[in-house]
Amino acid sequence: MGYKLKRWPLVAFTFTGIGLGVVLAACSALNTSNLFPRQNRSKQLIGFTENNIIKPEAVLKAALAEDNGTETILRVNFGEALKSWYQNNKDRNIATRLTIFSENVEDEHDNLLDQKQQAEPINWPIELQKEYDQWGGSESSWKALKLYDRLIADFQSLIFSNIVANVQLTDGSDQFKPTTKDNLDSTSNKIKFVNSKPNDPNGEFFANLQAYLFAQWVVEENPLPLTQAFFAYQAPKDGLDSLYDQAAIGSALQLGYAFPAFREPNNGQSQGKTTFDPTPNSAQNFGDFIKAVFPEQKNGQTQQSNTSSRTGLFDWQTKWNTNGAANKLLVTKSNLRGAFKGVGLATAIIDQYEYLVGGSKTSSLPEVKVDSNKSNQNPLDSFFMEGKDAVAIRSIVSRAKIAMTDQTPGFKVNPAFVKVKQSQQNDTFYQNQRKLSGGQSGDNNSQGKHHYLQDAVRLTSSQAMAAASTGADSSSGTNVGGSSGGNSVLIPLPRSAALTHTQQQVQQTTSTLQTPVYARGDDGTYALAIDGGDYFLANNKRDFTKQADILLYRYLQAKSNNFKENGVEFSLNLLESGSLFQTWAQTGLTAKLYGALVAMMGSGQGTQVKGSVQGSSRAASVSVQTTQQNRQQSTDTQESEVVKLAKSLLKSSADLAKPFTDNPTFKKALTDIQSEYKDYLAAAGKLSEFKKDLGEVSGLQQAIIDRADKYIQLEKQAQKSAIGLGQPLPYQRASDGSYPALEKFFIPEDSAADGKVKASESGSAALVTLKTTDSQKSTNTVKQPDIKPTRENNDKKLKQLTSDVETKASSLITKWGATPQIGSQFSEIVSLKSKDNKPQTNMILALLSDVGIKWTKILNSFKEWFFTNTNDFKNNYDSEKKELKGNEYKDFNDLVKQTLYLRSWQRLTSKEKFGYYKELGSVKAQAAQSGMVSLSSSAAVANAVASSGMQKSGDQTLLELGKKAFESELEASSSDGQYKYLRFLSTLMWLVKDGAKNYKRLLQQAITVGTRAFVSWTVSYDDTATASAAAAKAQVAVLKTAQATNTQSDNPFNKFVQNPDYVQGSETNWFNDKSTPIKPDSLLESESTYNFTAEPFDDKTKSQKRSTGGTTNEKHFFGFNGLTINSPQSVSTASAGLTEQIFNNFGQLVTSSDKSGALSQYKDKATLKRLIQNTNSDAELNAFGEVLHRAVNVDTSNLGRFNSSGEPLISFDNKKKFLVDVVDKLDDVYFNKFEGYVGQTKVKMSDSSSSSQGTKTIRKPKPHHSPRTRVSRLWAMSFRLPTRTLTKFLLVEKLIRTVL
């Protein structure tokens, strides 16, 4: 083990400036320009030959693996199919349009030709070919694609040109009805897509297609109509600094999320007073809102209006929205994050959705009682709570040992964050804010109570809370902002609990009526409800027909200005240009149009035609079944949910498939596409949609990370008071960094055993029936939402879908049988032709090959071939395990992984991306669990896992996190991680082969004669844990130095600091992890915290044990800086503070007694004398004189002087004699090789120092001098030998381990 550890520095060395920069310069950059297959102008085919790097199959497969494959295939084939629709259309105006488009293309080509001939009279054929190359490589492909693009764009415009007029209200006989208020609310009337142009031969076809696309959008995008009431923050009448402590907070005191406030209503607001403020008062609006939405002593809640056909509608008055904010919003899964200011509002909507659909039986938000009889309400009061220590908390700022439980009520307020002024007045309006930091209104820890803060809650009336209180534990907390009545239950409640008997009678189809979610935003507080959510999310499912009905109902209400309630008005852009629906339809337009037409064409057969893309297959069979028999019903015999929804949106006599019988040529063209491409298009559609969903999940995670990082930075910068009322979001994060309770809104869980339809069979946001146990039926016990990590399952799903696409693409490529063909003599793309030599297929091949050859994956394959095609690399690289093999290299594998894992993890923008770690871990144990290496027995595996700490539930080691980061780099299709990994291994092999001769040569080049070079470790730690970061940064003295012995337990160089400089976030649980973060070391500033060498601190002890065959007491050196060279050409990245200490403070005569090591770069007196005697340059002698003057304070000023004649005062020979005499008289202590701690003064390694500045350490570098003369001793014997000559290797081992 001792020998293998010495490979670590060599691996590390390649990441230093010298190890990587110099080696790559020596190897030269890889020039891939001459590797790309292309055809030269002599028609000699040089691409895709037998001896070329890649084959056509590889390029085509790369192109087909991405969305571009679907778009290219359909661009050509669907474009050609549309020609038949235009040519054979009953509307002769449509056929005329085709003729006009064809003529336009010819005109455009003539103009292009004229432009090129005029601009390049001689080279115009070359320039013209460049244009052709972008459109398939020939004149015919250029014209065809130009026409196809025009037809597709025109077809899309025809579809949507009349969509607004086609949405109409109809009666039971499918007859038009005016959109009056009564007609809209009548249960006998339905909203349909109808043909508003009965004389148009294509009118019915367009209406059908509109209905289908709208249905597909509803199923896939899950559009949610929202009703909102917005209450903008407003500063108190005496200013924000009358509430918050301006002196403590400083310039960060700005009205907003961190420092929210509302102006007290009726305070100088009365008409006739000189202080009248015409601005609407948000607090007054909030009070009016509560009184209207939660009236006391009434059987029902008028917050929701119930028509005879629709329930759960929210009609909130426009006046409740401050500053004219809209009271109706439309969000989908694709725009949810961008629809709000702050991710907290978006997550609150997701929680509300999950709460209504019943997928988790609960919510992450507590229900809070509001008192509609209370006057002078502060809109912030609903977020404040108080409780005893028995209540779990989401923050560990107090270091209280309180475990997370399922009844977590909120975020425990840290008084260090909240600086609120105390008032001498009895201002009950602000009393809860003043409680947060203690004082007049109640101490923050009075009577054993603590104050808590919610980011979002669910508002409910006292009636609902009274109904819910039976059987619930009311001791968990108290809402300090509600009524003066009894305590309210501050835990998430099952929906069935929040009902009065009358409400249950009103709506029999659901377990409860919705209570609005109330959340804090950046600019104010928001009350939000999913309009009609109880209607279309009833019975634990999403009813697509009812969801579409609500959307269209609200759309016609807004369009006709026929609103149900007085004071309620809104607009809703549902179908017009620029709407979310049309934006979605125009993204991947060709695929959506083709998929819709194919599904419609097959609908008349009773089953959906398979192979459509962009969601038809995903949307299939998401209907919620309540019995096991129905769950098992084959999707092959079920109509697509999209088709069923589309039919419900059309007149009863409508037939989606009928228009195709009127144009059999068009139908045949679509059928031909299906016949050839259905398997690939279906697989590619699933992959595309899943990747889109993953993108939304990733975006949500990143938004939460960015939000948390903002607060972490404030803590790191000792600006806690700027955090104010900032808090974590209430949604728990899993150990892998995912937020499962939120992410299932985008990617439903694959859990058929629980009654959920698999994600591959469902619409993206559809959640379905859940099994209800007897215990759940009879109790109000709250269950914490499942926080099972999602990343691994998502990765598996992505790999599965990707593999499926690759398989289908391979079959397609085999069918094509593509081979190179000679194209234009001026073409710069490789032309391919298929076996059948069809023009459309050849056009597809040309487009795919041009795209594929530029794809990152293909580009990387060229680079990787540069390594894998060399015999030396192939013979020493295991391509299956992706690691080195062979006696000379295989022992490096663990250290290679360790190095790369840590490097990848350190490069993460957010170190919390994959969760927290508890310890360093073991490479072998980590690799054994992942199958990367084999251990001899199951016992060995168990022991390895135990030693790494991986058996602890919820804990991860640093190397486990590093492995995740490393693998994500390798697997990213848009990165060149795999190539860089091979380059790293190749560089390592080049460095260490043949006794590391290249490694030694590079070191000798870097450490020139007389150059000072050090290797060093830098760490710091705070013994008292009381210093502020700002004060610590001002300290530069070395304090309380640890003893350099193996037995010194507090040796900072052997101590693994788990969270230095807040690298894994602050002590506050800003990410709301189940496993809370560890306390940060806010004083450590080393940039190489996790770089280390596995060696004992005392080399002598290790050497003695090795020589006797004993085991070594190996320890990790943390905070490793690597090799630092004092040279203008140095490529060292060492910090300025480090170089100042080791090169300026050390190495020159500071005091008369401070001599040790001043000339250590010359090894000894004899070496320096020999260098002077062998010098033939006068300038070099003068330089030696300057070195001696600076290092030992010898007066050498006359060496460089000249007499009046311009001749040197001292001759060359006399200079040399003078310098040799000076050196000969020097004390040997000047040549001591320095090892020790360096602060403002030099101290030996075993010394300890103290300072009047206290006991806090900011920097503690331990340099180790590495003279050039030691380099030649490296690798004098093989690493594999069991014994070695100690006199040769004592210094070598130190040098080897120092180069990270």
Swiss-Prot record:
Primary site of residence: membrane
Protein topology in the membrane: Lipid-anchor
Signal peptide (from-to): 1-26
Comp. bias (Basic and acidic residues): 785-797
Region Disordered, annotated ranges: 464-487, 620-639, 774-797, 1244-1269
Protein name as catalogued: Uncharacterized lipoprotein MG338 homolog
Keyword Cytoplasm: no
Family: Belongs to the MG307/MG309/MG338 family.
Alphabetized UniProt keyword annotations: Cell membrane, Lipoprotein, Membrane, Palmitate, Signal
Membrane spanning residue stretches: none
GO cellular component: plasma membrane
Alphabetical list of Pfam families matching this protein: DUF3713
Organism placement in taxonomy: Bacteria, Bacillati, Mycoplasmatota, Mycoplasmoidales, Mycoplasmoidaceae
Cellular localization per UniProt: Cell membrane
Lipid positions (S-diacylglycerol cysteine): 27
Keyword ATP-binding: no
Compositionally biased spans, kind Basic residues: 1257-1269
InterPro entries found in the cross-reference section: DUF3713
Species, as recorded: Mycoplasma pneumoniae (strain ATCC 29342 / M129 / Subtype 1) (Mycoplasmoides pneumoniae)
Lipid-modified sites (N-palmitoyl cysteine): 27
Segments of skewed composition (Low complexity): 464-478
Biased composition (Polar residues): 620-637, 774-783
